[in-house]
């Protein structure tokens, strides 16, 4: 496709998505609800439209940008990060009322900072929609900046980015000069940037500020794996199973099971957790789901959304099960195994050992229960162009973050395939029958079944 054709296609997709969002916001506004934002629980069509606008906007920028535009964008983003770090360091955001404007000098007095610096820094962030100046000399929160006061974890994530990850990233070349190719966790860009022999994991245990910031950064900057799992798994042909039991092994939440049982009335889900306390978390999660679906009162009909959600929760069972222990559910049609994702604390060698233990625990069941399937779900590094550019950019970002902080890397698809092929089962082996990845997610599902060894 030519450059002009790609421009036209992106512009058309963006216009369609923007129209969908505008219609949703207008409807919300007419209903007496805030109409200037898209809530997380908006219809899937609207959330997809939002992602389409973001993706196509970035595609258009890439298609049109000249070298000078590229340098200028990097310069702006560099200054925005520095400004956000400055605002966070002096607690400036907390000095601005959530619902009103205030004079710059009053904020400067409260934060004990020079008013001229505050004005220049705030006006830079305003160009990105962070804060606003409703009238000359007065500053106020915007829809983008207010959550950083209401949810301090957002500011923690930004501070980790500016104080820890950015310096580490900028020392990547020096780390390569000093150590070359290495897998040692104490010889990475983080160590070079902060002149320490302690690994990132060790530093986390010693520095409370870093210990508080990392989970926030991981949550908001590295993205939600569970959403990606649901995106991939809901595309499988569940209807073909009929009335069947599905086991979600070592799940962190019951969200996937809740989504699938609500959509497919013939499925029964067993959700297994490694920790006892998770059951309480899931109970609260399921209660919240019922409330969200209007189940705090008896459903008005047997066919409405509330009634369907109530029936779905009846087909969902929670269990505790230790990692690698024998599987007590032996008659399921599908076993969903979550292969953990790489992190500064978990290398591929550790993930492989955990996955091997789980695969071995299910191997005999697959051999005895002909027709049972195993689905291994994980996050892998996509091949260039395999997913949307925004998804690939996040995947590359995660991979480089792991390298800079701990000399760890994201998994390759070939490594997961090799892992499945390495599982030995009496009288046969696991055979990969399907790989499923969507262009909107970094998650991938590997479907495998037992195949008897041919004699002779």
Curated annotation (Swiss-Prot):
Main localization, broad class: nucleus
DNA-binding residues (ranges): 104-123
Entry annotated with the keyword Transcription regulation: yes
Feature: compositional bias, Polar residues: 290-300
Subcellular localization, as worded in the UniProt entry: Nucleus
Region called Disordered, residue ranges: 290-314
Record has Heme as a keyword: no
Record-level Gene Ontology MF annotations: DNA binding
A GO term from the CC aspect: nucleus
Disruption phenotype: Strongly reduces the expression of dothistromin biosynthesis genes such as hexA, hexB, pksA, adhA, vbsA, dotB, ver1 and dotB, and the subsequent production of dothistromin.
Keyword line: DNA-binding, Nucleus, Transcription, Transcription regulation
Origin: domain of life: Eukaryota
Induction: Expression is 8-fold up regulated when aflR is deleted.
All residue ranges annotated as the HTH iclR-type domain in the record: 74-143
UniProt function note: Transcription coactivator involved in regulation of the dothistromin biosynthesis gene cluster with aflR.
Name of the featured protein: Dothistromin biosynthesis regulatory protein aflJ
Lineage, highest ranks first: Eukaryota, Fungi, Dikarya, Ascomycota, Pezizomycotina
């Amino acid at each position: 496709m030519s450059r002009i054709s790609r421009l036209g296609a992106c512009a058309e997709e963006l216009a369609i998505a923007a129209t969908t969002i505008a219609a949703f916001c207008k409807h919300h506004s007419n209903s007496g609800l805030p109409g200037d934002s898209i809530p997380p629980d908006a219809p899937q069509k609207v959330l997809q439209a939002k992602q389409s606008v973001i993706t196509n906007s970035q595609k258009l920028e890439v298609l049109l940008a000249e070298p000078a535009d590229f340098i200028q964008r990097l310069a702006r983003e560099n200054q925005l990060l520095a400004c956000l770090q400055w605002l966070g360091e002096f607690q400036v955001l907390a000095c601005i009322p959530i619902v009103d404007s205030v004079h710059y000098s009053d904020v400067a007095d409260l934060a004990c900072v020079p008013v001229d610096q505050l004005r220049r820094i705030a006006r830079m962030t305003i160009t990105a929609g962070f804060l606003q100046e409703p009238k000359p000399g007065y500053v106020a929160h915007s829809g983008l900046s207010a959550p950083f006061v209401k949810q301090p974890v957002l500011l923690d994530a930004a501070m980790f980015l500016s104080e820890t990850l950015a310096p580490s990233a900028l020392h990547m070349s020096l780390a390569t000069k000093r150590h070359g190719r290495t897998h040692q966790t104490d010889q990475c860009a983080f160590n070079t940037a902060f002149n320490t022999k302690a690994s990132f994991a060790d530093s986390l245990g010693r520095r409370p500020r870093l210990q508080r910031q990392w989970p926030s950064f991981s949550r908001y900057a590295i993205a939600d794996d569970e959403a990606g799992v649901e995106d991939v798994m809901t595309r499988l042909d569940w209807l073909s199973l009929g009335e069947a039991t599905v086991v979600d092994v070592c799940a962190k939440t019951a969200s996937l099971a809740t989504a699938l049982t609500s959509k497919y009335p013939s499925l029964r889900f067993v959700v297994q957790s490694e920790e006892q306390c998770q059951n309480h978390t899931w109970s609260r999660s399921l209660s919240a789901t019922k409330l969200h679906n209007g189940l705090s009162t008896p459903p008005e009909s047997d066919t409405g959304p509330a009634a369907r959600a109530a029936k779905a929760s009846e087909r969902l069972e929670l269990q505790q099960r230790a990692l690698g222990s024998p599987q007590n559910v032996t008659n399921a049609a599908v076993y969903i195994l979550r292969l953990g994702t790489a992190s500064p604390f978990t290398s591929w060698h550790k993930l492989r050992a955990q996955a091997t233990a789980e695969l071995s625990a299910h191997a005999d069941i697959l051999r005895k229960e002909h027709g049972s399937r195993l689905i291994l779900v994980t996050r892998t590094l996509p091949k260039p162009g395999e997913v949307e550019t925004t998804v690939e950019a996040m995947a590359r970002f995660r991979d480089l973050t792991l390298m800079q902080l701990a000399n760890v890397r994201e998994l390759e698809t070939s490594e997961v395939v090799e892992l499945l092929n390495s599982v030995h089962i009496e009288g046969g082996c696991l055979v990969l029958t399907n790989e499923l990845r969507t262009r909107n997610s970094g998650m991938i599902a590997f479907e495998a079944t037992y195949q008897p060894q041919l004699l002779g």
